[in-house]
Design a protein with these regions (language model features):
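Surface-exposed cleft-lining segments at the edges of enzyme active sites
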Residues: 10-17
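Catalytic His-Asp segment of secreted/periplasmic serine-dependent ester chemistry enzymes
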Residues: 17-111
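A short helix->loop->beta-strand "cap" motif at the edges of active sites that frequently abuts
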Residues: 1-7, 37
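Long, charge-rich low-complexity segments
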Residues: 111-122
Length: 122
C-alpha cells in the first residue's frame, strides 16, 4: 500500500546465549516473509563480528544492550539494508567513541552480512 515496505529488525542474541542467534534469525525471517517485510539482519552481523573477533565488546555490562560498537554495527547493517550500499568508508559521528579501525571492521562485517543474507553481489 502506498509503495511502503515494512522493515523488521532481526535482533541479536544475548552475550551469554549465542545459541539464540539462529532461533532469532529463523523466527524473524519467517515473520518477514509472512508480512512481506524487509528483514534487517543485525543479529547475524553481531554473530559474525564476534566470530571474527571474539574480544570485540558489542554489549554493555547487562549483556543484552549494545555497546557503542554494537550500536554502530547495527547502524551500518540498517544503512546497508535500506540503501543497498556498502557502509565501508562512512564516517562515524557518534557521541561515544568507536576506534577508526574498529569502525572499518564493523562496516565490512555489516556489508558482508547484508550481501550474504539478501544474496546480493558485492
Amino acid at each position: 500500500c502506498f509503495g511502503i515496505q515494512p522493515l523488521i529488525m532481526m535482533t541479536w542474541a544475548r552475550k551469554n546465549k549465542p545459541e539464540m542467534t539462529q532461533q532469532l534469525a529463523d523466527a524473524t525471517t519467517k515473520v518477514g516473509n509472512e508480512a512481506d517485510a524487509m528483514v534487517i539482519p543485525v543479529g547475524l552481523a553481531f554473530a559474525e563480528a564476534i566470530k571474527q573477533d571474539p574480544k570485540l565488546e558489542l554489549y554493555r555490562a547487562d549483556k543484552t544492550h549494545p555497546s557503542p560498537e554494537g550500536t554502530y554495527l547495527e547502524a551500518c547493517v540498517v544503512f546497508a539494508s535500506m540503501y543497498h550500499r556498502s557502509p565501508v568508508g562512512l564516517k562515524y559521528y557518534g557521541i561515544e567513541q568507536v576506534e577508526e579501525k574498529t569502525a572499518h571492521f564493523l562496516q565490512e562485517v555489516a556489508w558482508n552480512t547484508v550481501c550474504e543474507y539478501f544474496d546480493w553481489k558485492k
